[in-house]
């Protein structure tokens, strides 16, 4: 059958990339079709039941700032919220939400089903209609042809997916779901650069068989943070604790004894796994000097006893999984509900993409998510939104858009993928961003919401809330700048009494806030401020980090001017503070002549280039003084 409706955008896949892609295109007014093999699994959390974390929550906030669904779904489904790196600087603070799988998925599905311009159809895609070098349509498993102007492919782990438990293997996109074999073959016919990656998941545990009394409870933060700029604590369901236990030498001996039946260590799995989320087999091999590893027992939801033991992802045979689980303190009688497994799947070298996530070989075909070599819901969602908005703009012959590295973590993600490529699953960290003080969680809306509004991604309600917030920030900052505390006036005396700090001369409330040990809550109490916590936090960060932020803006401008800066032939990379051993060795081997050349060396990060630039500048200043 030839379906009568012609779409602007067709999105294949209903995971985290696909849902954000479809929602973005539909919000922009494009006629959009989301093809999924199973409507019941839209927005499903296939691995760990959590959203956010270091580097990742920055992406979630950026998705949210552009009108995406992930952050609000996390607020509606989150059963524990924590601020990570809370004692560190604002640039690296991150929000993490432990999610109820069912509630999160329900929130995503509700958003999809209530989005104007978006049709959903349950059917696997088997073929792409390509005429010349341009995609024109999609053919489903039962032979239905859908015509479209653009296609966004978000296949996750389904392309040629193979599940491994011990030396047994079976076809699957994830446990219980079939793989996408026909589409995998079709993409290989298009001569796109394909490779294999792998990821894994731990066995799931019945909480009723666990002794929590010997474990360390890990409660959420109070007051509870929110993930979305539009979020509110009232959205949160009941909050619960996670629990921490550890592996031990007995656990490690059991694992070592099973390595001869491990698909990873017998060469059965060829795909490369995620470096920063290794299996327990990898951990005891790579960190042989450690006699224990943390295991976080995370509830899968409020209406289930199922636990996710974060830290023991494995593809060992089930009998070994059974023994290793029961060797862990508090889990001596644990009942496994589902075995852990590894999954191997196709991905395509992201260097074959444009910065808009459109393939270079096939016009109007966009890739997003794990198909590009990334790992993580947040990385997938960010790519999905970018691919969706660019497919939507291409459908109406509008200019494509990708944020720069100094504008968003999304920009860092895309630039890393396209410039460097990847041979292992790519995960976002704050350390990948050289301008991270400018790319904080709290200001994602300032950086991106106005851009999103221009492109039609941000609705009236979100835009009004953003404008109200920014007006409050501006008004309150101006108010505090005109409130003065002096040693002998009431405000000054109250400040000294309240904080125990010295006050030797007159200064504004803004100047008081600049002090290291003074926070906005104290200033609010002192001055009678009525603004929200979100507004207060934004003001405090802007005030305290003003000098550093201004310096980083200067660095952005200077790095652009100095892209062709010469590196002295005898430059000593060993004196560059903060440069990793791996990057130092690469620079010593290649000996780049310019910063631009250094930037192009695979594995040399923009942050490393900036460190080299700063050292060159310091050396030049030292020579001038001498």
From Swiss-Prot:
Keywords: Cytoplasm, FAD, Flavoprotein, NAD, tRNA processing
Cofactor(s) for this UniProt protein: FAD
Record-listed FAD binding positions: 13-18
One function term, GO molecular function aspect: flavin adenine dinucleotide binding
InterPro entries per record: FAD/NAD-bd_sf, GIDA_C_N, MnmG, MnmG-rel, MnmG-rel_CS, MnmG_C, MnmG_C_subdom, MnmG_C_subdom_sf
Gene Ontology terms: biological process: tRNA methylation; tRNA wobble uridine modification
Compartments in which it is found: Cytoplasm
A single GO cellular-component term on record: cytosol
Residues annotated as binding NAD(+): 273-287
Role played: NAD-binding protein involved in the addition of a carboxymethylaminomethyl (cmnm) group at the wobble position (U34) of certain tRNAs, forming tRNA-cmnm(5)s(2)U34.
Subunit structure and binding partners: Homodimer. Heterotetramer of two MnmE and two MnmG subunits.
Family: Belongs to the MnmG family.
Protein's name according to its UniProt entry: tRNA uridine 5-carboxymethylaminomethyl modification enzyme MnmG
């Amino acid at each position: 059958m030839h379906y009568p409706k012609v779409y602007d955008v067709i999105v294949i896949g209903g995971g985290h990339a696909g849902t954000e892609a479809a929602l973005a295109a539909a919000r922009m007014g494009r006629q959009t079709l989301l093809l999924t093999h199973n409507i019941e699994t839209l927005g499903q959390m296939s691995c760990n039941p959590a959203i956010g974390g270091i580097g990742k929550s920055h992406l979630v906030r950026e998705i949210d700032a552009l009108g995406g669904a992930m952050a609000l779904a996390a607020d509606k489904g989150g059963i524990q919220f924590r601020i990570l790196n809370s004692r560190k600087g604002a640039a690296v603070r991150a929000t993490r939400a432990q999610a109820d799988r069912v509630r999160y998925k329900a929130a995503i599905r509700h958003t999809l089903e209530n989005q104007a311009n978006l049709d959903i159809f349950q059917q696997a895609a088997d073929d792409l209609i390509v005429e010349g070098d341009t995609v024109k349509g999609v053919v489903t498993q039962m032979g239905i042809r859908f015509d479209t102007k653009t296609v966004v492919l978000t296949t996750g782990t389904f392309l040629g997916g193979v599940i491994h438990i011990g030396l047994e293997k079976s076809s699957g996109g994830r446990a219980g779901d079939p793989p996408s074999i026909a589409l995998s073959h079709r993409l290989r016919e298009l001569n796109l650069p394909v490779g294999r990656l792998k990821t894994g998941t731990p066995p799931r545990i019945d909480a009723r068989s666990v002794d929590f009394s010997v474990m360390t409870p890990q409660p959420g933060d109070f007051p509870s943070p929110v993930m979305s700029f539009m979020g509110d604590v009232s959205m949160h369901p009941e909050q619960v604790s996670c629990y921490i236990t550890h592996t031990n030498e007995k656990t490690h001996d059991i694992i070592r004894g099973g390595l001869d039946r491990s698909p990873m260590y017998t060469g059965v799995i060829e795909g490369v796994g995620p470096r920063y989320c290794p299996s327990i087999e990898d951990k005891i091999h790579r960190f042989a000097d450690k006699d224990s590893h943390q295991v976080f027992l995370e509830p899968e939801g409020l209406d289930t006893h199922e636990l996710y033991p974060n830290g023991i992802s494995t593809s060992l045979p089930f009998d070994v999984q059974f023994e290793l689980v029961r060797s862990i303190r508090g889990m001596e009688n644990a009942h496994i509900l589902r075995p852990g497994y590894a999954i191997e799947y196709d991905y395509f070298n992201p260097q074959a993409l444009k910065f808009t996530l459109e393939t270079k070989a096939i016009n109007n075909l966009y890739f997003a998510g794990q198909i590009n070599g990334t790992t993580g819901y947040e990385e997938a969602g960010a790519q999905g939104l970018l691919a969706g908005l660019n497919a939507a703009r291409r459908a109406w012959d509008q200019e494509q858009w990708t944020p720069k590295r100094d504008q968003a973590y999304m920009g860092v993600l895309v630039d890393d993928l396209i410039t460097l490529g990847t041979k292992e699953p790519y995960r976002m960290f704050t350390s990948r961003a050289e301008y991270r003080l400018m790319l904080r969680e709290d200001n994602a809306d300032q950086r991106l919401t106005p851009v999103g509004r221009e492109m039609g991604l941000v609705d009236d309600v979100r835009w009004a809330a953003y404008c109200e917030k920014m007006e409050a920030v501006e008004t309150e900052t101006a108010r505090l700048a005109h409130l003065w505390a002096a040693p002998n006036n009431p405000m000054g005396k109250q400040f000294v009494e309240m904080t125990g700090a010295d006050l030797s001369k007159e200064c504004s409330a803004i100047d008081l806030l600049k002090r290291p040990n003074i926070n906005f809550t104290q200033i609010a109490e002192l001055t009678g401020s009525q603004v929200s916590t979100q507004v207060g936090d934004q003001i405090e960060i802007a005030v305290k980090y003003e000098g550093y932020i201004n310096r980083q803006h200067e660095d952005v401008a200077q790095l652009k001017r100095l892209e062709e800066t010469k590196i002295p032939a005898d430059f000593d990379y060993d004196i560059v503070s903060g440069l990793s051993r791996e990057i130092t060795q690469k620079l010593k081997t290649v000996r780049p002549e310019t910063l631009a050349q250094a930037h192009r060396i695979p594995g040399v990060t923009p942050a490393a280039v900036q460190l080299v630039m700063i050292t060159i500048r310091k050396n030049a200043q030292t020579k001038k003084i001498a």
